[in-house]
Amino acid sequence: MATAKKTTPPKKTAKKKEITRHDVITAYMDYVLEHEKTPKSVYKFAKDNNMSEADFYNFFGNFDGLRKDIWNTFFTMTMDVAHKNEEYAHFSNREKMLTFFYTFFELLTLNRSYVLFTLKENQHMMNKMEQLKGLRKHVKGFAKELIQERNENKTNILLERSETIYSEGAWVQMLFLMKFWMDDDSAGFEKTDMAIEKSVNTIFDVFDNIPLDAVLDFGKFLWKERMA
């Protein structure tokens, strides 16, 4: 008796993994650490990491844009962690700034090898500043929000503080702390934690018109650490 031939169903082709922004960033950071240099071309980088050039260009126009976005991601992740603390909304501005810096440098420490590579690899300050442009904008915006909150609580206009000066000061403070952290050889980077506390307290004390003792204390700390 004739029977119908069994047909073999066509094999399903494996669905290609969707490449995310996080995948590209992780692949780039791994690449520079494993090869101790930056990739020469998007084509070669993509091929080595099982993605297409289109996958890369979906998120970044070039490697410069990727490097900037890594710093933006550090900031975003820092704020996400801070806001997960239910008490954060009730913190004073001083406490919010301390929380920001402590969390940011904890994150940098988790990625210390990459951060040291990318900043030291670009020896010229302008190159460093180029990849930090987005971070600078975020930090200044964060500081501006804090000073706006403070000014809203002041009934006397003479007691209000300059948003521009304060936000720029916060960025200069960030650069100083990054350099301090890069050179810090203390266990657990405890000296960086001390620098964060003293610098933030000094900045807020200056803005609260009680600068002298705090500035002197911070100055002595810096002198001791740099001269040790």
Say what each PLM segment does.
Residues 37-69:
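Helix-turn-helix
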Residues 18-26, 57-83, 87, 94, ...:
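An amphipathic alpha-helix adjacent to DNA-recognition modules
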Residues 2-31:
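Basic, helix-initiating cap at the start of DNA-binding domains
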Residues 161-180, 194-202:
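Hydrophobic alpha-helical segments that form the core
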Residues 90, 152-158:
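Acidic/His metal-coordination segments adjacent to aromatic residues that form catalytic metal sites
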Residues 2-8, 183-228:
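C-terminal peripheral helix-coil segments that are non-catalytic and often amphipathic
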Residues 129-154, 164-176:
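Amphipathic alpha-helical packing segments from all-alpha helical-bundle domains
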Residues 97-119, 134-147:
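Helical hydrophobic small-molecule/effector-binding pocket
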